[in-house]
């Protein structure tokens, strides 16, 4: 993956590309890899670095869809289980299994979650990782000694997937190159070029050199996440907005909170969301929040209210 050689190839290309993807996050990289692996002449351009925004700021989990079980969305649970199994088998060096404990503070909660996760195990079938286990109070404390033990009854342990989101994106970019495509970062789209009212080319700025040039293509895929409406309105100024933006924040704590490496899922918070405490690179990631935020920017900031929300629910 040599950026200079890629730009040279891009500038020397006379024929239109088959596919140009705008956006180098998980969605854009996935689209570009799919196209390149099917033999389409493909180029991806990203205005910043690969996975620079949402795609590198996740809770680092490959969900099997357990959160959708509560919503009754069985089809999405099945889809998530299949996707998790594919990643665990095909990208085993980036994805691994992770145990989670759901602590319970009433006897009925233990059976409520146990029965729900039993059904989840049945849905998973051969796609499951390990069977759900019911723990008594001491077994929970053995795994998570920092747990608030006041009124603690026990818990339920289930298994899910964990991955390095940014590394998987970088590997996907490399695989695009391996399949004959180009994935170029710090290439900002500055203008949409049309012929007879049809989009036929992009004008892009090489942020690192300051040089601009055009890229012609037969088709274009817009995968810029929260920035999608900006380009859509460059195309047609009165295009209706289609993106509703929100901000999800995490805080990072010391690994001493989860010394055994077992993650926690807190099923009840003050706003009804789930809260995860997940071991990660000798630290613990705690989150996430979900609040509306119309201030679209590359580097959002966590508010004091979000930190208070996480700490309040984490310390219960």
Task: Spell out what each predicted region is.
Residues 28:
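N-terminal Rossmann-fold NAD(P) dinucleotide-binding loop
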Residues 104-180, 184, 192-198, 203:
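Flavin (FAD/FMN) cofactor-binding and adjacent substrate-gating region
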Residues 23-25, 47:
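Glycine-rich Rossmann-fold phosphate-binding loop(s) that bind the pyrophosphate
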Residues 45, 93-96, 214-215, 222-316:
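Active-site substrate-recognition segment that forms the wall
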Residues 15-17, 209-219:
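Core beta-strand elements of the Rossmann-like FAD/NAD(P) dinucleotide-binding domain
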Residues 60-143, 275:
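Dinucleotide-binding Rossmann-like beta1-alpha1 core, especially the glycine-rich loop
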Residues 1-19, 34-38:
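Extreme N-terminal leader/targeting segments of oxidoreductases
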């Amino acid at each position: 993956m040599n950026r200079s050689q890629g730009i040279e190839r891009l500038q020397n290309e006379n024929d239109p590309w088959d596919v140009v993807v705008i956006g180098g996050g998980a969605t854009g990289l996935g689209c570009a890899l799919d196209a390149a692996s099917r033999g389409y002449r493909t180029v991806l351009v990203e205005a910043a670095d690969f996975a620079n925004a949402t795609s590198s700021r996740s809770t680092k989990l490959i969900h099997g869809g357990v959160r959708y079980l509560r919503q009754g969305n069985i089809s999405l649970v099945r889809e998530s289980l299949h996707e998790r199994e594919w990643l665990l088998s095909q990208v085993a060096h980036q994805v691994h299994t992770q145990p989670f404990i759901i602590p319970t503070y009433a006897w009925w909660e233990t059976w409520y979650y146990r029965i729900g996760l039993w059904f989840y195990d049945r849905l998973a079938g051969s796609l499951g990782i390990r069977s759900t286990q019911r723990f008594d109070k001491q077994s929970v404390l053995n795994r998570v000694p920092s747990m608030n033990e006041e009124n603690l009854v026990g818990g339920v342990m289930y298994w899910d997937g964990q991955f390095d989101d940014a590394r998987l994106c970088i590997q996907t970019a490399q695989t695009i190159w391996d399949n004959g495509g180009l994935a170029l970062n710090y290439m900002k789209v500055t203008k949409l070029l049309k012929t007879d009212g049809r989009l036929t080319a992009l004008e892009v700025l090489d942020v690192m050199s300051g040089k601009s040039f055009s890229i012609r293509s037969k088709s274009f895929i817009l995968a810029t996440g929260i920035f999608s409406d900006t380009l859509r309105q460059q195309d047609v100024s009165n295009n209706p907005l289609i993106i509703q933006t929100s901000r999800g924040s995490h805080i990072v704590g010391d690994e001493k909170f989860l010394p055994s490496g077992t993650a926690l899922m807190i099923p009840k918070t003050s706003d009804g969301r789930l809260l995860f405490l997940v071991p990660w690179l000798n630290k613990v990631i705690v989150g996430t929040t979900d609040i509306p935020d119309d201030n679209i920017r590359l580097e959002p900031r966590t508010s004091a209210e979000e930190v208070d929300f996480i700490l309040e629910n984490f310390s219960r």
